[in-house]
């Protein structure tokens, strides 16, 4: 849209580009510590905790647009982060703690009041693998950790790690290269990663596979993200498109570029207030209407940080704002403002 002004010349306004806002690293200014964003979480104060690939952890206050950086410094490995490549974050509000999983850095705990950081690795604990890609509370004040070699149970009070080696019936647990953990509304545990997806029932420290998934390629597909919509449908983002699991109908349906998806690598999935699904891919962001099964796709030309996004790097805040992390920072927007363009 071109706008003529009295003394200001001719201005160009793009109704779509101006709906997207990007947050990026700006050298020598208070900004994002690194442009490659790997995880995003909101706390009760509506601050965002943003993990990056090489810049550690960022605490971002949207109202003031100010950042606080937490990163590994030289000669600090004994009492700081084990790595600046952050893969997962969980905020424990009642205890004022932030749990941080890293690639090649183990598990760290940030004490928000004091700023003290504890780090657990293979040298000082029984953590079997220092690549912690997912952190999930188990409902009993303990945590499950998804690592690249096993599922690990962590007891914060005892500061103890237990590798889950078998199911409760004795069946060996051979899950490796776990990249995402999810708990559905029925309290079942979903584990996804390079080797596919599995569903378990959990009771304390014991878990047992739940045979709810019908035979499908999704069980073997490299899983990036698992999401439950408000209507109870489970959506799974993979490197081979995304899948919808309808448990009532015992049916799985797959969507790919043949259906209108811009790219088959789906990194993250979020639902808006209209029931539409927003997905980050390797070719921009796609909005999918489950009722009509129609796609609306957005690219870097529409104002995104890049066409490429990152695994599990997405979050919908309590205010309805959506954030997707990519290779050039964050793209944020309110989906309700992105109405269909009639032209």
What do these predicted ranges mean?
Residues 1-343:
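Carboxylate-rich, polar loop motifs that coordinate divalent cations or form catalytic acidic clusters
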């Amino acid at each position: 849209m071109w706008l003529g002004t009295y003394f200001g010349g001719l201005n160009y306004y793009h109704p779509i580009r101006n709906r997207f806002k990007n947050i990026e690293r700006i050298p020598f200014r208070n900004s994002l510590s690194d442009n490659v964003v790997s995880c995003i979480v909101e706390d009760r104060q509506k601050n965002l905790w943003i993990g990056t690939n090489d810049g550690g952890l960022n605490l971002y206050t949207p109202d003031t647009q100010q950042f606080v950086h937490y990163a590994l410094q030289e000669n600090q490995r004994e009492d700081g982060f084990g790595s600046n490549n952050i893969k997962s974050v969980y905020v424990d509000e009642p205890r004022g703690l932030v749990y941080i999983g890293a690639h090649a850095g183990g598990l760290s705990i940030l004490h928000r009041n004091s700023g003290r950081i504890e780090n657990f690795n293979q040298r000082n604990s029984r953590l079997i693998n220092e690549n912690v890609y997912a952190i999930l509370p188990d409902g009993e004040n303990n945590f499950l950790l998804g690592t690249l070699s096993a599922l690990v149970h962590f007891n914060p009070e005892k500061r103890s790690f237990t590798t889950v080696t078998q199911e409760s019936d004795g069946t060996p647990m051979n899950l490796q290269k776990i990249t995402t953990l999810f708990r559905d509304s029925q309290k079942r545990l979903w584990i996804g990663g390079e080797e596919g997806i599995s569903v378990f029932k959990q009771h304390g420290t014991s878990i047992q596979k739940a045979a709810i998934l019908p035979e499908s390629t999704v069980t073997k597909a490299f899983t990036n993200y698992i999401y439950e919509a408000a209507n109870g449908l489970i959506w799974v983002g993979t490197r081979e498109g995304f899948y919808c699991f309808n448990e009532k109908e015992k049916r799985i349906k797959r969507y790919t570029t043949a259906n209108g998806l811009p790219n088959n690598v789906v990194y993250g999935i979020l639902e808006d207030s209209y029931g539409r699904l927003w997905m980050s891919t390797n070719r921009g962001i796609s909005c999918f209407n489950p009722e009509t099964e129609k796609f609306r796709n957005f690219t870097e030309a529409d104002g995104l940080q890049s066409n490429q996004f990152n695994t599990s790097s997405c979050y919908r805040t309590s205010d309805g704002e959506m954030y997707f992390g990519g290779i050039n920072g964050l793209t944020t927007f309110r989906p309700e403002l992105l109405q269909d363009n009639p032209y």
